[in-house]
Amino acid sequence: MLNLVSLLLKKSIVIQLFDITVYKFKAKFWYKLPFETRLRIIKHTKPKALSATKQVKRDYRKTAILNSMRK
């Protein structure tokens, strides 16, 4: 399973979403991944620190999953 994830990461398109970098898969590949794998990918791509002007706490994983489901 890890090989599949790394293969998908290499072939994925990187986009900016809410000032964070997330991996955008084609929907057919993204939804075939297990839910835990999707969360792990999103968790590893969220920013390490927010700027001083952006102190609003957001749930990036939930936002990214909801946005990927809309497409």
Swiss-Prot record:
Domain of life: Viruses
Full protein name: Non-structural protein 3x
Organism from which the protein derives: Canine coronavirus (strain Insavc-1) (CCoV)
